[in-house]
From Swiss-Prot:
Name of protein: DNA polymerase alpha catalytic subunit A
Region DNA-binding, residue ranges: 1246-1381
Residues with N-acetylserine modification: 2
GO biological process: DNA replication; DNA replication initiation; DNA synthesis involved in DNA repair; double-strand break repair; lagging strand elongation; leading strand elongation; mitotic DNA replication initiation; premeiotic DNA replication
Binding residues annotated for Zn(2+) 1, in chain numbering: 1287, 1290, 1314, 1317
Keyword terms: 4Fe-4S, Acetylation, DNA replication, DNA-binding, DNA-directed DNA polymerase, Iron, Iron-sulfur, Metal-binding, Nucleotidyltransferase, Nucleus, Phosphoprotein, Transferase, Zinc, Zinc-finger
Biased composition (Polar residues): 166-176
Cited Pfam families: DNA_pol_alpha_N (PF12254), DNA_pol_B (PF00136), DNA_pol_B_exo1 (PF03104), zf-DNA_Pol (PF08996)
Gene giving rise to this polypeptide: POL1
Keyword Zinc-finger listed: yes
Naturally occurring in which organism (per UniProt): Saccharomyces cerevisiae (strain ATCC 204508 / S288c) (Baker's yeast)
Annotated effect of mutating residue 238 to K: Increase in length of X' and Y' telomeres. Reduced interaction with CDC13
Phosphothreonine carried by residues: 172, 309, 313
């Protein structure tokens, strides 16, 4: 008994150690008098700490729980052990951080990676429910032995010191771990000779790989420190349920406990995440006819299942061996659907088919998710783990070296580095045609297949600039595993795959799928020719949130799910489709109870099922269980990616929902270690990874917006109206309002809104055919469907080129990581070069002609080149492989390749896409089945989008295939073609009124449609005769055209029906009404004005009709007789609202901040809808300062609530939203009068009087200017500033206009006198103020402020563009002009001079300072005799003042003409 009690005492110590006590407590037998701890000084403490860091696996028998000493004092009693540093955006700081945190990789077996992230409480909870199970001592001892195993016997390989040095310390890559195995641990390493045979047959087939044979690596184990104690302990506790269950959970919960080591994550985050491999095991086969049960009320933790490593490790990786199978309990929230192997696999061929939808990368293995076809033709969800994938490395030999030389040098080194027994390699001839200099166009490379799964250093990549005596460049070192798989297996997007030799027993409960298999040989996976895809299970999702003001966090109140279980993408989705199931989950908004009668009222009035929960955690647990049961392939929603998935994930994380991984198909036990702590980009990556397996179809992301270009705010109601042509008036639900907690009708109305939004989201996605189109695009590009759904056009271009060039035997460029890109940027900044990460190309783009501004009343033809840039690439055979370019100077324009050069890869790819689209369009014309016709239309759209976007990869700086010389050549040929087209039109006496990149607008001079078309067809024939592939065609026919500026016009487009009858439709491009910052009222007014101006009415009559219409609008605005929603203004935030430096003066920013404070989700990219309101009469009192426009801006929903008494500001909307855009529309119309326009809108006409007739400072060469000697001073000085004087006695300021009548001053016989205080001005006081005013105007001129002449831009700056007068604003084509020109300054000086000119004062030839209708117009006027008398009496004073002005006029260079420069030619 004493022996047994001693062993039980040891067991208690072991449990105490595992529960948080220091592991040193478990030391065997110790006397009670032994000290628990030692007292040491700081120096000794640091010394011991250094020793502990050198042996970080210091815990005895920790069963892979994950205790590692990282040098940080930790409280082991805490349950949460997922601590990590905060992420930062500074790449430089990350690099330095990595250097400090590099971990020594050891040659452990797979159990060394089995480190759980579960808390102790979770393990004990599972232990209580486990059955007693016998664990063989040998198995336990083997596992323990792996943690204490000694160093391996090292092969004594002599390697070149230079190459070894490069591999061990490469500053440009992650290849940082030491690879030396000769100088191992002195206590455990022994020199051993290794006999190796290297056989290279130069004449052998390239399909044969070279192998280097090595003797097996021997393991030499050290004695366990407490082996005897553990052995004795296990004799008695082998049947202990606690230990058995703990062992089981440690193994099973290892599966995917940490974030994946994806390449993109490696570029962003520290490399100290988990090194775990994927640990999978097949669960026991069960019948398909099982009952689906979801126990929502269960409060117990879900039971877990064990996972073991898939056995199919790559060649040469003997360290990754599978563990034995363990049984597990069934998860109560898991869908109990399991499929037998016999139901899936064809016994004759040992194959089965899977349609793959999505993927994820986990610890150097690839997992595909999709649907497997059963023998009864039904489909179930499936997961396939692919092992044995290899990275293809290409080593380029130095001159005089061969692949054999590289093999003898690099293969032993790679084997040593990655712990491999053998590596496959072979010589292979490859081509290269990209932008790296000094790379031959074709050469013999050493192709090396390096497994992604290696016993050690698996996270290290080979740097491309690695070199030695035998080679000087390496390609393919940083390729990711998904890219390698699809390129090597030639898989083009989602399709049916034939999978042979799959293992149905190696994976168990690793996912939420019905079928789980592993494949050890990637070559056993091949795409099939089957075209019909399986039906998809789609789930539409809508979430309502509430801001918790105490924690400043968004909480979830309601979730609505609508299930569509058989969505076929091979045929159009019916417009009236109804969900197969509809369910709403809701919890009380503010307390623990609902309004009385909610359940009954919801059952009566709301569609579908409504489930009530007491708290948010129970609701989210049920939501995860329903996802598990429904098992959707696609999750549809509005703003899922940017808003609601983020809120959902954070709430499940904060509430510790154990089944959170149901939102994806990968079973997870713990959250990513750094989730919620890093920046938003990393959180977005984590959420995408958690959702892997289920496609996220967000109708409001970049892809959804590209398919709905007519939307402006992309609100759900707007998208519904534009796409489905149905109205939905959204309700603004604010659950902070107590009415939703107290009023059952209000709560029911809020739930109805969520249900409506859920169903609308699905309907919009089906109408825009988002899933169908993105699938076609993905099949063309060969990338992942999820990437296309996210809207990454650059990713599609990259993959289609990767596939095409790889098939043609080319080495493709390596993907540049964020670190290397940032390093290049720093180097360029040090060299004073432009940053390389700028997405804008630094070369000339398309040619844009200066427009013939004004109204064109004749028919105008729009002649457009079909796909100009793709056609240029084909026409002139422009490709990486054909254009000879200077790779040392990328700014040098290359020449067009000769005609005898073979067709390049890129032109051939584009030609294939164009031909396929042409064939599809032919089928469309003859197809009678409407369903097939729709499918053909989608396919031709996908082909068109793919072909037209191919050029973009050449000029996109961050593109993998960026080639600036090729992009320059393409755009240069485009400019040349457009110019030649214009010259051809002018040679035919046709007027080109405008041209832009790939089209020209030609004024035919005809007022008859048939004659205009005849001219267009003749012009088309002449242009097309010049080219082989380039084609121009009539794109549009304008009956009338109003050209405002570059890229800004309005026109009446003529459309012919089947009977040949023409109808006109207004087409607008680039004008104010197309911009979201102008309200619907402004757009309605602008459309009415354009329709009136472009009509067949007389111009004078049309203008009068416009003025009358605007007067009616003014009355309606002032009397508030227009709907509130007509006043809404939309502004998109380009960054977080708190990040705007001048946010106080920006209405959208102020509204966004108030919305965030109220609990709404507002971030960069959000579109803010607001209304400018009128200041209250109480606030508008004389002693109350006027509120700014930003302070008077309110969200639309606030204005629509009548109790708020918010009224739109009539003055603001009439002046800023109506007057400004209408003036710009009419400024080119003859007889337009800006003063008349201002009067029609009730604005102050005096503000616009000086603008009548235009104010161009004499710089517009198109306007006729009268001679300076023929105009009066009133006309000449209409834009000058009045001279203001200040009384030296009372400081009263007043305008001085010479010897004239005034209410503020008088010119007496004694001089100038202030009427307010009767104080006389001395000559010095007068002249000093004159000089001060003159100097202020001179300073304004020399300030050099520039302003864009485009009224829609209006940018004001002092910076001068390197392109001269080009506007600095992105996308603006205006011209920068001086805001205060030399002519204005000269006229200002002349005006001051005229004020003191005695003769002009006598004749009263002065600019009047008052108008007759002014309120301060003087009642008494000076007589002619008194003016003359006063002038003579004050002549001395007047001449003194004039002398000051003359001094500056004499220095003004504008008043002089250099005759010598004009007539210099006559002197020669």
């Amino acid at each position: 008994m004493s022996s047994k009690s001693e062993k039980l005492e040891k067991l208690r110590k072991l449990q105490a150690a595992r529960n948080g006590t220091s592991i040193d407590d478990y030391e065997g037998d110790e006397s009670d008098g032994d000290r628990i701890y030692d007292e040491i000084d700081e120096k000794e403490y640091r010394a011991r700490k250094r020793q502990e860091l050198l042996h970080d696996d210091f815990v005895v028998d920790d069963d892979g729980v994950g205790y590692v000493d990282r040098g940080v004092e930790e409280d082991w009693r805490e349950v949460d052990n997922s601590s990590s540093d905060e992420d930062t955006g500074n790449l430089a700081s990350k690099d330095s951080k990595r250097k400090k945190n590099i971990k020594r990789e050891k040659d452990h077996q797979i159990t060394d990676m089995l480190r759980t992230q579960h808390s102790k409480s979770t393990l004990l909870a599972h232990a209580k429910k486990s059955q007693k199970k016998s664990i063989p001592i040998d198995n336990f001892d083997d596992i323990l032995g792996e943690f204490e195993s000694g160093e391996v016997e090292k092969p004594n390989i002599l390697l070149p010191s230079k190459l070894r040095e490069n591999l061990n310390s490469s500053p440009t890559s992650e290849f940082k771990s030491s690879i030396k195995r000769v100088n191992g641990n002195d206590e455990s390493s022994h020199d051993a000779g290794i006999s190796k045979k290297v056989k290279i047959d130069p004449d052998s087939s390239t399909d044969k790989y070279l192998e280097i044979e090595s003797s097996p690596l021997k393991l030499q184990s050290r004695k366990l420190r407490y082996a005897n104690d553990v052995q004795d302990l296990l004799d008695d506790v082998e049947n202990s349920p606690v230990v058995a269950t703990k062992r089981q959970n440690v193994l099973q919960d290892t599966l995917l406990a940490n974030p994946p080591s994806a390449q993109s994550l490696a570029d962003e985050e520290d490399d100290e995440d988990s090194d775990e491999d994927i640990i999978l095991k097949r669960r026991t086969m069960r019948s398909v006819t099982t009952t689906r049960r979801v126990n929502i009320d269960s409060r117990s933790n879900p039971s877990t299942s064990p996972f073991v490593t898939a056995p199919g490790t790559p060649i040469g990786i003997k360290g990754l061996t599978p563990s034995k199978s363990l049984q597990s309990n069934t998860d109560v929230a898991t869908l109990a659907v399991n499929v037998k192997k016999e139901d899936v696999v064809d016994p004759e061929t040992d194959t089965f088919q899977m349609f793959w939808l999505d993927y994820c990368e986990v610890n150097n293995t690839l997992i595909l998710f999709g649907k497997v076809k059963l023998k009864d033709d039904n489909c179930v969800s499936a997961m396939v783990q692919i092992n044995g994938l290899c990275r293809e490395l290409f080593f380029l030999p130095r001159e005089g070296k061969t692949p054999t030389d590289i093999h003898e040098e690099i293969i032993p080194l790679l084997m040593d580095k990655y712990g491999l027994d053998n590596i496959r390699a072979k010589p292979q001839k490859m081509k290269y045609s990209f932008e790296l200099p000094d790379i031959p166009s074709e050469s013999d490379y050493l192709k090396v297949l390096l497994p992604y799964q290696t016993p050690k250093s698996s996270r290290d990549t080979i740097p491309s600039d690695l070199s030695s005596d035998t080679f000087y460049h390496v390609f393919g070192g940083n390729s990711n595993i998904f890219e390698s798989f699809v390129i090597q297996n030639r898989i083009m997007g989602p399709c049916w795959l034939d999978i042979k030799g799959a293992d149905f027993n190696s994976i168990r409960n690793a996912s939420h799928c019905a079928v789980e298999v592993s494949v050890d040989k990637p070559q056993n996976i091949t795409p099939t020719t089957t075209k019909t895809m399986p039906n998809l299970r789609c789930l539409s999702l809508s979430i309502q949130t509430l801001m918790n003001p105490k924690e400043n966090k968004q909480e979830i109140v309601s979730i609505t799910l609508s299930a569509y279980r058989n969505i076929s993408l091979d045929s159009p989705i019916p417009e009236n489709i109804k969900p197969d199931d509809l369910c709403t989950l809701v919890r009380p908004p503010q307390s623990t109870s609902f309004p009385l009668g909610l359940a009954a009222l919801a059952k009566q009035k709301l569609p579908g099922r409504v489930r009530l929960f007491n708290n948010e955690k129970a609701m989210l647990s049920c939501f995860c269980a329903m996802l598990k049961v429904e098992d959707p392939d696609v999750i549809i929603g509005h703003r899922l990616q940017n808003v609601y998935l983020d809120v959902l994930a954070h709430r499940m994380h904060d509430l510790n929902i154990p089944t959170f991984s149901s939102i994806g198909r990968r079973l997870r036990r713990t959250w990513p270690e750094k989730f919620g702590r890093g920046n938003s980009n990393m959180n977005h990556f984590f959420i995408s990874d958690i959702c892997s397996g289920r496609l996220i179809c967000d109708i409001a992301n970049e892809m959804g917006q590209s398919l709905t270009p007519k939307c402006q705010s992309w609100d759900l109601s707007e998208m519904y109206q534009v796409t489905c042509e149905k109205e939905h008036k959204p309700l603004d639900i604010d659950y902070q309002n107590p009415q939703y907690q107290n009023d059952v009708n209000s709560m029911t109305m809020a739930l109805q809104e969520n249900i409506t939004n859920c169903m609308i989201s699905a309907e919009v996605s089906y109408r825009i055919q988002l899933l169908t189109l993105t699938k076609q695009l993905t099949n063309l590009a060969g990338n992942a469907w999820a990437q296309t759904l996210g809207g990454t056009r650059a990713g599609r271009n990259e993959y289609i080129l990767l596939h095409e060039f790889s098939r043609n035997g080319f080495i493709v460029p390596d993907k540049e990581g964020n670190r290397s890109r940032a390093q290049k940027q720093r180097q360029n900044e040090e060299n004073a070069d432009a940053p390389v990460n700028s997405k804008k190309a630094k070369y000339q783009g398309g040619l844009v002609f200066e427009p013939e501004k004004g109204l064109h009343k004749n028919y105008v033809l729009v002649m457009d080149f079909n796909s100009l840039y793709p056609s240029i690439i084909q026409e002139f055979n422009i490709c990486f492989t054909t254009v000879d370019r200077n790779k040392e100077d990328i700014d040098e324009l290359p020449s067009v390749p000769p005609s005898e050069v073979d067709q390049g890869v890129l032109p051939r790819l584009l030609a294939n896409l164009v031909d396929r689209r042409r064939e599809v369009k032919k089928v469309m014309k003859t197809e009678t089945d409407p369903h097939k016709r729709v499918q053909c239309d989608i396919r031709q759209q996908a082909l068109k989008l793919t072909a037209n976007s191919m050029y973009g990869c050449l000029g996109y700086v961050n593109s993998r295939f960026y080639a600036k010389p090729l992009a320059m050549l393409v755009t240069n040929k485009g400019r040349e073609i457009l110019m030649n087209t214009r010259q051809l039109a002018e040679s035919m006496n046709l007027l080109v009124v405008y041209g832009d990149t790939d089209s020209v607008m030609i004024d035919t001079g005809c007022d008859n449609y048939a004659d205009a078309i005849k001219i267009g067809l003749g012009f088309k024939r002449l242009v097309n005769e010049r080219y082989r592939l380039l084609e121009i065609d009539i794109d549009n026919v304008f009956k009338k055209l109003l050209l405002h500026a570059k890229k800004k016009y309005a026109a009446l487009t003529v459309n012919l029906d089947k009977n040949g009858n023409g109808t006109t439709v207004l087409e607008v491009k680039g004008l104010d009404m197309k911009r979201r910052e102008f309200c619907p009222l402004s757009r309605d007014v602008s459309i009415h004005v354009l329709n009136t101006i472009l009509s067949d009415k007389d111009p004078e009559e049309a203008l009068q009709e416009v003025y009358d219409y605007l007067e009616d609008i003014r009355i309606k605005v002032e009397t508030n007789n227009i709907r509130i929603d007509k006043y809404k203004i939309n502004m998109k935030l380009s960054k977080d609202p708190k990040a705007y430096p001048g946010g106080k003066n920006m209405p959208a920013v102020q509204v966004a901040l108030r919305m965030r404070k109220a609990g709404r989700v507002v971030k960069a990219g959000s579109v803010i809808t607001f209304v400018i309101t009128k200041q209250d009469e109480i606030d508008n009192a004389a002693d109350t300062p006027a509120l700014s426009v930003a302070e008077r801006a309110h969200a639309l929903n606030e204005v629509m609530i009548k109790s708020n008494n918010l009224i739109p500001d009539p003055q603001y909307y009439l002046e800023k939203q109506i007057f400004a855009p209408v003036e710009r529309l009419l400024e080119r119309i003859d007889s337009f009068n800006v003063v008349r326009l201002s009067e029609a809108l009730g604005l102050d006409s005096k503000k616009y009087f000086r603008r009548e007739g235009g104010n161009n400072n004499g710089e517009d060469i198109n306007n006729l200017q009268p001679l300076e000697t023929t105009i009066t001073d009133v006309e000449r000085f209409k834009d000058t500033v009045t001279l203001e004087l200040s009384c030296p006695s009372c400081d009263k300021r007043f305008p001085f206009g010479g010897i004239v009548s005034s209410n503020y001053y008088r010119v007496s016989y004694n001089g100038l006198q202030c009427k307010h205080c009767e104080q006389l001005f001395t000559p010095l006081q007068l002249t000093s103020q004159i000089e001060h005013s003159i100097r202020a105007h001179i300073s304004l001129y020399y300030a050099g402020w520039l302003q864009c002449d485009d009224s829609t831009c209006g940018i004001v700056t002092r910076q001068v563009s390197v392109f001269g007068k080009r506007c600095l604003n992105d996308g603006c084509t205006g011209v920068m002009r001086y805001k205060y020109s030399d002519k204005q300054l000269y006229n200002q000086l002349l005006y001051f001079d005229s004020l003191f000119d005695c003769e002009k004062n006598k004749k009263q030839e002065l600019k009047p300072i008052y108008l007759p209708d002014d309120l301060d117009y003087p009642k008494e006027q000076l007589t002619e005799s008194s003016i003359k008398a006063l002038t003579e009496q004050n002549r001395e004073l007047m001449e003194t003042g004039r002398s000051v002005v003359q001094k500056y006029l004499n220095d003004c260079g504008r008043r002089y003409v250099d005759m010598t420069s004009i007539f210099d030619f006559m002197l020669n």
